[in-house]
Amino acid sequence: MRTITKSVIGSPGRSGMSAPALVTLASAIVALLVLALSATTAQSAERHDGKTIPLSGGKTLLKIDKDTAAALSDAGVEVEATGAAEAPTAKRPYFTFPIVGGKVHKDPLGGRIVHSGGLRFSADSNSVVVKRFVIELDRAVLTAKVAGTGQRITLLRLGAPDGVKIGDGRIVLKGVNVRLTNQAAEALNEALDTDLFAGGLLIGEATVIAKYGDDDKGEDRHDDD
């Protein structure tokens, strides 16, 4: 068997490119790829820089699902507002959590929304406080700090909003269903010595009203509450 060792490039009787021509073509392709990559990177940076919005205030409202509230009450579990959060009233049947910082980019919608205040879950002599809520829009979750532990857990999973409005200095997300995560269910069951909580439990419906448009740079203005 004869082994062919001669390159087809520039071989007699073939129409292949010469080595210098091939090198020139390869260099041109590399240059085009570099230019394309640079343009894509620049466009991406422009897209994020031009549409990233630092938040200056606002609030997130959480209305507890009626069936879930009844189940918690029947089991002797109380849910209370802590810190800067406000508890439901007859006129305002929802918990209110002030927005104290964060940054959001418009398209696609993403970023972080930072809150003050929190919730205390208690049963008998056991209790646990979750606070410093952060909505992570890119992951569609709400994380929380567990008081006294320094641990931050993924507390809630967020459904797609029924409506989104951006303008007039506000970002409004309406009709966001929130469900307990497996991690949060385990933490609550352990802290309260119960087996009541389960991942996927519908907690309720949230409405986010975030403000922007002043000199605030989206920095968190509350150290801890």
Predicted features by range, described:
Residues 13, 24-26, 121:
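An N-terminal domain-start capping segment
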